[in-house]
């Protein structure tokens, strides 16, 4: 029987966070309802944290791989102990139900009445207009931090986020260049299917918006049709309901789990945004070693997703969250983030008509403290058929790709265009100086210099396939495009490299971005160089502004896609 052939425009799980219109205010929240908020305390020694992380992640340093504990990095940047205790004690005296002092953040669970009185704000019930079962409590208006603690608090998180609940848009797809299944990925990048997985190697698929889940029956079907071991999620953090699977979570778990083989899999759902996730992660015992985040939103618009009210700005939110990302890298975890699905114009200019800001950056994909992942696609099929005996059953019903030539993933050939460019806020880190300088010296055409900051962090760092993936969803197979596909795949590759190191008594890769550039500098053929294509198009239009792929690193596909055997060989040389 022919399976359902729908092409899902999933891509990066971007957030339409001008989303207040999606929610209907239902009146004041009941006084006894409990909610959780976070007081972000003013930090110190941030320059020391950055220097330390760059030192222990430099493969040429004598300190390489000497990762820290969460307690060590938190104590480094936290305010004086008496300050955090003063804030926590004040909140306890005010009558909060539960107060947890994490040194540079105080987490409070309290009834609505307490929060309204303490922060001089008003809380309301909001009901989603289409998914009416979804009801949240949020503030309407500003808030005021009590004078007794105001000088020690940067902002309060958890009051203003309005989740964007979206259904994937669909389109019938021809799949003329062949479909992507785990078999194709293993073959293209040379990933062995019998790689010795260490029991402590782990990968975490993170979903935001608190409305994400996968279905275990879909995992069984996916494994059977692909002749692979069924992915088992052994750690679940946050809400999970397998009865209402969605495309994003399904893609992450099926491909992150499949390519990582038998690596321990975590599934983590978050109602709020990046700062909230990062602080919870840092306070988790024995957290996963690799984290894949297929979500993002324009850097200058973080106040639409984060907790900016009153004097806070998107810049301040990004800076503070980047500190938390540095801490995560320093304790031994690799963070990966998607580079976006709306090309260089991004979600700031999806209709390609902005004269003020024709190019966009994305967060966390443009953070210097995550491994930013772009997307490629394969060219037309080769004339020679693949060996039928080697193909899994799924390739009998669907024409799996046999091409080995990668191009930039871009509209109109694909349903998304890989994002890339330069951060609005973060300076260019030293680990990519040489690669970015070579790009500017290459002679490749550039956008007007007034439209981007060449001195800032360039992204993405790497890429992987992001077009024509097949996933099992609600009993059928469907197609998916996006950096939401490439990110968990590269995360799985990092998990394999971690297994090698752990099997040999070495620490995990952790903050692996400097390693990528040092590997590239030592031998550019460790990566497949993508030199055809650009990222000038969005879903709705193609702009005259954007970046072109060229030899070496570029703000389209980074240094390229992995040649696993060569990347492993480089990792094998490290202490």
Curated annotation (Swiss-Prot):
Keywords associated with the record: Calcium, Glycoprotein, Hydrolase, Metal-binding, Protease, Serine protease, Signal, Zymogen
One GO-annotated biological process of the protein: proteolysis
GO molecular function term, any single one: tripeptidyl-peptidase activity
Reactions catalysed, as given in the entry: Milk clotting activity. Preferential cleavage of 8-Gly-|-Ser-9 in B chain of insulin most rapidly, followed by 11-Leu-|-Val-12, 19-Cys(SO(3)H)-|-Gly and 24-Phe-|-Phe-25. No action on Ac-Phe-Tyr(I)2
Positions annotated as active site in the UniProt record: 248 (charge relay system), 252 (charge relay system), 484 (charge relay system)
pH effect summary: Optimum pH is 1.7 with hemoglogin as substrate.
Post-translational modification: Autocatalytically processed. N-glycosylated.
Cofactor: Ca(2+)
Amino acids binding Ca(2+): 529-530, 552, 554
Propeptide: 19-173
Residues the record marks as site: DNA-binding: 529
Reported regulation of activity: Inhibited by diisopropylfluorophosphate (DFP) and diazoacetyl-D,L-norleucine methyl ester (DAN).
Residues in the signal sequence: 1-18
Sugar-bearing residue positions: 200, 262, 307, 380, 453
Keyword Transit peptide among UniProt keywords: no
Record EC number: 3.4.21.103
Residue ranges occupied by any Peptidase S53 domain in the UniProt entry: 179-574
Record text on cofactor binding: Binds 1 Ca(2+) ion per subunit.
Keyword rRNA-binding in annotation: no
Superkingdom classification of source: Eukaryota
Protein name in UniProt: Physarolisin
Organism: Physarum polycephalum
């Amino acid at each position: 029987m022919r399976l359902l052939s729908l092409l899902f425009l999933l891509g990066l799980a971007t957030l339409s966070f001008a989303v207040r219109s999606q929610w209907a205010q239902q009146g004041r929240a009941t006084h006894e309802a409990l909610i959780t908020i976070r007081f972000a305390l003013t930090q110190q020694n941030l320059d020391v944290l950055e220097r330390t992380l760059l030192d222990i992640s430099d493969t040429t340093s004598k300190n390489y791989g000497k990762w820290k504990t969460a307690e060590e990095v938190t104590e480094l940047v936290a305010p004086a102990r008496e300050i955090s205790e003063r804030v926590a004690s004040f909140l306890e005296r005010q009558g909060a139900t539960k107060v947890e002092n994490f040194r540079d953040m105080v987490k409070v669970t309290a009834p609505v009445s307490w929060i309204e009185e303490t922060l001089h704000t008003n809380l309301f019930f909001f009901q989603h207009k289409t998914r009416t079962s979804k009801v949240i409590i949020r503030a309407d208006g500003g808030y005021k931090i009590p004078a007794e603690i105001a000088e020690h608090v940067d902002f309060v998180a958890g009051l203003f986020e309005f989740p964007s609940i979206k259904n994937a848009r669909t389109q019938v797809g021809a799949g003329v260049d062949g479909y992507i299944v785990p078999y194709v990925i293993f073959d293209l990048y040379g990933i062995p299917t019998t790689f010795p997985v260490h029991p402590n190697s782990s990968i975490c698929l993170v979903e935001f918006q608190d409305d994400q889940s996968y279905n275990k029956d879909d995992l069984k079907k996916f494994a059977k049709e692909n002749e692979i071991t069924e992915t088992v999620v052994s750690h679940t953090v946050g809400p999970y309901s397998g009865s209402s699977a969605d495309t994003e979570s399904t893609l992450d778990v099926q491909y992150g789990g499949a390519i990582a083989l038998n690596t321990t899999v975590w599934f983590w759902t978050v109602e709020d945004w990046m700062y909230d996730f990062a602080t919870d992660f840092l306070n988790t015992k024995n957290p996963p070693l690799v984290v894949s985040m297929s979500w993002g939103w324009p850097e200058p618009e973080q106040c639409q997703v984060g907790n900016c009210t009153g004097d806070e700005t998107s810049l301040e939110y990004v800076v503070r969250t980047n500190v938390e990302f540095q801490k995560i890298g320093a304790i031994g975890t690799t963070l990966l983030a998607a580079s976006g699905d709306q090309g260089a114009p991004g979600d700031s200019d999806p209709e390609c008509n902005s004269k003020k800001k024709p190019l966009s950056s994305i967060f966390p994909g443009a953070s210097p403290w995550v491994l930013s992942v772009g997307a490629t696609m394969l060219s037309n099929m080769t004339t020679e058929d693949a060996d039928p005996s080697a193909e899994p059953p799924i390739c009998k019903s669907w024409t799996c790709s046999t091409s080995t030539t990668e191009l930039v993933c871009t509209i109109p050939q694909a349903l998304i265009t890989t994002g890339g460019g330069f951060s609005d806020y973060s300076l260019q880190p030293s680990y990519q100086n040489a690669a970015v300088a070579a790009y500017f010296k290459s002679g490749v055409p550039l956008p007007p210099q007034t439209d981007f900051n060449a001195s800032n962090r360039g992204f993405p760092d790497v890429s992987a396939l992001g077009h024509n993936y097949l996933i099992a969803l609600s009993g059928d197979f469907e197609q998916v495009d996006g950096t939401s596909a490439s990110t968990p795949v590269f995360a799985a590759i990092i998990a394999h490299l971690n297994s090698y190191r752990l099997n040999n008594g070495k620490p995990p890769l952790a903050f692996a971005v400097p390693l990528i550039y040092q590997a590239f500098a030592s031998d550019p053929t460790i990566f497949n160089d993508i030199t055809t294509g650009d990222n000038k198009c969005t879903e709705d239009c193609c702009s005259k502004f954007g970046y072109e792929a060229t030899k070496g690193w570029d703000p389209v596909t980074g240094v390229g896609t992995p040649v696993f055997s060569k990347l492993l060989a480089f990792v094998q040389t490290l202490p």
